[in-house]
Amino acid sequence: MEKIQRYLQLKRSQQHDFLYPLIFQEYIYVFAHNRALNRSILSENPGYDNKSSLRIVKRLITRMYQQNHFLISSNDSNQNRFWARNKNLYSEIISEGFAFIVEIPFSLQLISCLERKKNKIIKSQNLRSIHSIFPFLEDNFSHLNFVLDILIPHSVHVEILIQTLRYWVKDVSSLHLLRVFLNQYCSLITSKKVSSSLSKRNQRFFFFLYNSHVCEYESIFVFLRNQSFHLRSTSSGVLLERIYFYIKIERLVNVFVKDFRANLWLVEEPCMHYIRYQGKSILASKGTSLFMNKWKFYLVTSWEWHFLVWFHPRRICINQFSRHSLEIFGYLSNVQTDPSVVRSQILENAFLINNAIRKLDTLVPIIPLIAKLAKEKFCNVLGHPSSKPIWADLSDSNIIDRFGRICRNISHYHSGSSKKKSLYRIKYILRLSCARTLARKHKSTVRVFLKRLGSELLEEFLMSEEDVLFLTFQKTSSALRRVYRSRIWYLDMISINDLANYKSKF
């Protein structure tokens, strides 16, 4: 990375970032295809790292610019095993390296921005962190009235993406090469089915395109939000996942103050909160239904006129939070009203005070979890445990370790649930499925197998983190034990993506 930074520092004197020559550098592909950083289908091909050289890169780019550069005959694929994995392997190799290169100016600009504002930004790690959602759910969400559940539009024209990236990447040759990639993958951007299949093989490239695309959506939202807040609040900087965010927010503020100074204090708008996760975003407010319809109109209009994206209004749902549940991070969240009766007595007069406390319930979606377990052959569709025949050839310790890892991942991910008793059924299914798999391997019944080895064998491996904490702090006060039995949001839960998307594997 130091070599790359020295290269960009040299070119910065010319007021341009010439990234195109970096494509021909071999160490770029060492970074892009590092097994520890990006485990893609290319890195699984044995001998690929040794073949990523300047000669191959030049040949690939030359063939990409030919007339029929994406057509590979079956005979050529059989003769060369290196190209047999994928017909579009030419462009995939270059696009992954290209995605790594164009991220460099973004990263350097963000670092320089944070260095200049290190005295003003206390928690700079929250600038691009999803962890800020957890305290938001605990503290503020239960006090909101309406929620806009938005499906972010994914259909966009190729040239719109090019125009967006021109503000960040000044190298014309790199943009021309990007246009070649986007013309090939235009069907991936408009077709969700094809995009989900091929984006897994080139995650870095598609993540970069998606984030740069959504980045512009959120910039419009920041402008509208600051308008309703009279430019007095920049708390959205903690929630918005933005690159180079604070410099852009200053420019928006300066333009708005200059042109609309007379209208700043006319209308007082209620508080707005914004969350983005996966392909959805959420706008929540204490305002009225009319206020939320205004925001819906603003968003649809900006997408259609500024980004030339036809967006159906039905993709934005306005829900009253007290009557509808919200699906977020694999949880079903809704607001429950808990009555609380307080008895007060003043001298000889006693009276009761009824208070209604709004609390956010984060529930575990048991039905989708059981459906996922049934798809993976741990149980049937009704939730009755069954053996896992494909694991019967493994060793006993390996079988128990696999079942225990799945059980611990589910407990770890759903530790923020307000009603953890619903997880007992999932643990029961996994525990009994593990016992039946072991009994199938030893050609015995579950009762005989557990009687011979003891049920403690499974309990030791399937013990939840809550039980471990309780055993660790047995001698502490009861108040501390109650803390560990309450909702706990583990910050590494976002790495368990499979539980947030039940279409994936565990």
Curated annotation (Swiss-Prot):
Keywords: Chloroplast, mRNA processing, Plastid, RNA-binding, tRNA processing
GO process annotations (BP): mRNA processing; RNA splicing; tRNA processing
Alphabetized InterPro entries for the sequence: Domain_X, Maturase_MatK, Maturase_MatK_N
Predominant location category: plastid
Gene Ontology CC: one annotated term: chloroplast
GO MF entries: RNA binding
Domain of life: Eukaryota
Subcellular location: Plastid, Chloroplast
Protein name: Maturase K
Gene: matK
